Amino acid sequence: MSQNNRDFAEITKIASDELDVVRVSRPCCDKYYITAHPAKDGRQYSMFENLGRFLRKHNAGIVTQDVFGGCELYADGMDALSRACGAVDWPVTWIEGYGLAPKKLTGTQVYAISGLSVQPVRLDGRIVGGVFEDDDARYCLLGDLRPTDTSCSRAEQARATLEKIEVALATIDMGFSDVVRTWFYINEILSWYDEFNMVRNKLFEERGVFEGVVPASTGVGVANPAGAAVVAEVFAVKAKNSHNVGISAVASP
């Protein structure tokens, strides 16, 4: 943020039985990190209703969203989400943890913002992210990036997903050099994680990523409704003012 904005930042927590929210408030905007839980009475989609009410109350829009639940619930869940929150014009990364009951939802996490305009990032006819900016930087969050062809090999799907990240970033004048964080949700991760890393490292070498700041990354073993070998999320930052915004590597714990 700019010098003026950085001088005035307030972090508050809002908690209830249904919602846990961390709000970061600055003169330019409010950012909301929201976790919503299903109702204890078994009404799973109530978490979307509570989310929608919160967003309307605070005049906030969703940039990206994760849903943790059975893949069988995807179609009905997306309908419930749109009824509660309006047209879904942001990426929803829907993932199912191993051992989860196929008809169970466990929660949703949302990054939302008010006070700044969020422009959608589109790729292949889908909204795959949002981009917004302040005086010092442009920020991009991408989600639900996955291969179009899920019948090809897992290595080919991994390569296709990485290339989609690159293409999506290029539409907003960003590249891998601007990526600070990646999340890869990998189906059957233990059976091919080494292979996935080989594919990722090869592309990073080709693009010169290892010559700069390498994005922090997390790999998680989960399934997805598309049946893809991998689904990705990305956070990228492109500084306008290097005096106030900087990206640097930190040691891994």
What is each model feature region?
Residues 1-253:
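Short, polar/acidic, helix-capping and beta-turn segments at strand->helix junctions
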